[in-house]
């Protein structure tokens, strides 16, 4: 099955459909047509994502894949797709929402590539990549049609992408749109755990690990950490401020399932330990932050909220 269909999702759905057909054919009282229609719809969903992925790969040909920052964002995109699927399935979401989460993950950072091409930077001051990406997809040219032919979810996808990097998620009243806006934000942060461990520090922050650890944590940055809040970009002064802000952002997680994955991989402690902190005071603060955050995560997991 895998050799024939080149996709685990499609192979499983085809195989299950085969079993279902055999079962209903031997059970005349079953609604064979209804069950087969459902299986066909599930297969269509995986085909939709495969088509979107192929279109995304074609879009990437407009950029220099050999560029370290471009490469980082390509890997991050597919990491977010996997993270979104993992979280969604742990939450028990239906297959349509799982596939929708994957499509949003695929397109969430589409604005980043132009930002890197123009400015060679991830800094929010150079471009609001989320708003730019939403405009790119849903503006007059309707680039979204390259990736998703069905327009039923346009508003949901646009809102989720546009708000995925907002400091705080606000202003969404539709329940399903809010679900996916929260889900992409969690998936984005979850894969950023991997990024902070695997990518070179020079690509991330322009200096090596020692250079990151030489700074002093700014008072406003530490206040945000102790308030269990994300750090404002404008409050960051030194490279160590950036590094600690990457950890503090994990207070802004929506679903306990995301925290479960983070704890399984021991992400917070591993990210903190990547940098050698020159000042004892900085090391002490990082230890405090890691301990408090892990306690907070465990409480959210226990309470399932």
Feature map (PLM): residue ranges:
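An active-site-proximal "capping" alpha-helix that borders the catalytic cofactor pocket
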Residues: 79-87, 128-141
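His-Asp-centered metal-binding catalytic motifs of divalent-metal-dependent phosphohydrolases/nucleases
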Residues: 98-125, 133, 137, 156-167
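Short, Lys/Arg-enriched N-terminal segments with co-localized hydrophobic residues
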Residues: 15, 19-38
């Amino acid at each position: 099955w895998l050799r024939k269909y080149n996709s685990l999702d499609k192979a499983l759905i085809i195989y299950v459909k085969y079993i279902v057909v055999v079962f209903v054919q031997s059970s005349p009282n079953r609604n064979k047509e209804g069950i087969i229609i459902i299986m066909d719809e599930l297969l269509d969903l995986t085909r939709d994502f495969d088509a979107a992925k192929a279109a995304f790969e074609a879009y990437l040909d407009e950029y220099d894949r050999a560029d370290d920052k471009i490469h980082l964002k390509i890997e991050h995109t597919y990491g977010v797709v996997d993270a979104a699927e993992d979280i969604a399935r742990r939450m028990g979401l239906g297959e349509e929402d799982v596939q929708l989460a994957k499509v949003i993950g695929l397109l969430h950072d589409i604005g980043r590539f132009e930002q890197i091409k123009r400015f060679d930077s991830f800094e929010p001051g150079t471009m609001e990549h989320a708003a730019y990406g939403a405009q790119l997809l849903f503006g007059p040219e309707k680039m979204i049609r390259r990736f998703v032919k069905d327009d039923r979810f346009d508003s949901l996808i646009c809102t989720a992408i546009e708000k995925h990097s907002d400091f705080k998620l606000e202003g969404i009243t539709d329940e399903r749109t809010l679900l996916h806006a929260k889900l992409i934000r969690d998936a984005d942060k979850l894969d950023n755990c991997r990024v902070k461990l695997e990518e070179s520090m020079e690509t991330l922050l322009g200096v090596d690990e020692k250079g990151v650890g030489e700074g002093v944590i700014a008072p406003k940055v530490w206040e945000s950490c102790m308030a269990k809040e994300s750090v404002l970009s404008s409050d960051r002064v030194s490279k160590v401020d950036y590094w600690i802000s990457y950890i503090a952002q994990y207070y802004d997680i929506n679903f306990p399932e995301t925290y479960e994955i983070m704890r399984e991989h021991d992400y917070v402690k591993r990210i903190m330990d990547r940098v050698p902190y020159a000042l004892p005071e900085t090391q002490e603060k990082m230890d405090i932050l890691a301990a408090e955050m892990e306690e907070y995560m465990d409480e959210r997991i226990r309470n399932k909220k």
